[in-house]
Amino acid sequence: MNKYSIPANALITVAGTVGVGKSTLTAALAERLGFKTSLEKVDHNPYLEKFYHDFERWSFHLQIYFLAERFKEQKNIFLSGGGFVQDRSIYEDTGIFAKMHADQGTMNPTDYETYTSLFEAMVMTPFFPHPDVLVYLEGSLPSILSRIEERGREMEIQTERSYWEQMYRRYSNWINEFDACPVLRLNIDEYDVHDPASMDAILVEVGKVISKK
């Protein structure tokens, strides 16, 4: 246990839409706690760039890849005994991304059924530790779009604004119904990852949420 009342074996998951600052906050929180990080491997994803050029052709491949990578990370967290801050949850894969593409017809129904069946089988295994708290990052759509622009990933910048708008709406609906673990909601304009006092304040709140479990 530390000064924030966060157990040494805790799993803290950071969630939120693309560009909201999950990876940056994940690293900052892990550093303050002396925890390990579980980061999304975007740079070495063999499908991501192809997906942004052709959603219908590559949506299933991309989501299966993410699911496999996420499950390997979950198993690693389990075998390591916890003490992790995780960048993006496996729940977002199925609750946001796969469902969005199934709903808009860029993932066919058979593929979506296969995907959800595999997801459900994975979360039933003992290798699947549920987060002690999900830290949900939210903010205005203009702020998030500005961050996507500043990040400078060409495949994201070239994606139509309507795609990000739809994802933003789906995230807002998803988090209001999410109940797999306790949730702490943070506005991205109300903290500074470079300010130790700001990070301490967040971790105090994380500790309070975990203590109420």
Describe these PLM feature segments.
Residues K22:
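Conserved lysine of the Walker
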Residues T17:
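P-loop (Walker A) phosphate-binding loop of NTP-binding proteins
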Residues M1-A10:
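Extreme N-terminal, non-catalytic leader segments
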Residues V14:
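Hydrophobic anchor at the beta1->P-loop junction of P-loop NTPases
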Residues E31-R70, I96:
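Conserved substrate/cofactor phosphate-moiety recognition/catalytic segment
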Residues I96-R170:
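A glycine- and Lys/Arg-enriched "phosphate-lid" helix/loop adjacent to the NTP-binding pocket
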Residues L145-K213:
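NTP-dependent small-molecule kinase module
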